[in-house]
């Protein structure tokens, strides 16, 4: 039991928050027409990547998800990437 707690404590210390990709590129407003940016937030299977994977804030994640859905409706992005 003690070993598990030590292992968990070590993992929590070494874990760093992910860098925000939108902030790094200087993007304030996510646009559905910017499909090159939106492709970074879609997995190879066509799923929208989670916040934990992308490092976005909750508000940015909602904006990206909405933009991806709009881009799919406008046929700028595929619904699946097979």
UniProtKB/Swiss-Prot annotation:
Region Disordered, residue ranges: 1-25
Any one GO CC term of the record: cytosolic small ribosomal subunit
Record has Oxidoreductase as a keyword: no
Domain of life, source organism: Bacteria
InterPro entries assigned to the protein according to its UniProt record, in alphabetical order: Ribosomal_bS18 (IPR001648), Ribosomal_bS18_sf (IPR036870)
GO biological process, one term: translation
GO molecular function (one): structural constituent of ribosome
Keywords: Ribonucleoprotein, Ribosomal protein, RNA-binding, rRNA-binding
Function statement: Binds as a heterodimer with protein bS6 to the central domain of the 16S rRNA, where it helps stabilize the platform of the 30S subunit.
Family from the record: Belongs to the bacterial ribosomal protein bS18 family.
Quaternary structure, from the entry: Part of the 30S ribosomal subunit. Forms a tight heterodimer with protein bS6.
Protein name listed in UniProt: Small ribosomal subunit protein bS18
Organism, scientific name: Corynebacterium urealyticum (strain ATCC 43042 / DSM 7109)
Gene encoding the protein: rpsR
């Amino acid at each position: 039991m003690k070993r598990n707690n030590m292992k968990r404590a070590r993992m929590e210390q070494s874990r760093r928050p992910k860098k925000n990709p939108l902030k790094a590129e200087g993007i304030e407003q996510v646009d559905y027409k910017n499909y090159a940016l939106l492709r970074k937030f879609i997995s190879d299977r066509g799923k929208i990547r989670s916040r934990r994977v992308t490092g976005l804030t909750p508000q940015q994640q909602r904006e990206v998800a909405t933009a991806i859905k709009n881009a799919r409706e406008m046929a700028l992005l595929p619904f699946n990437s097979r």
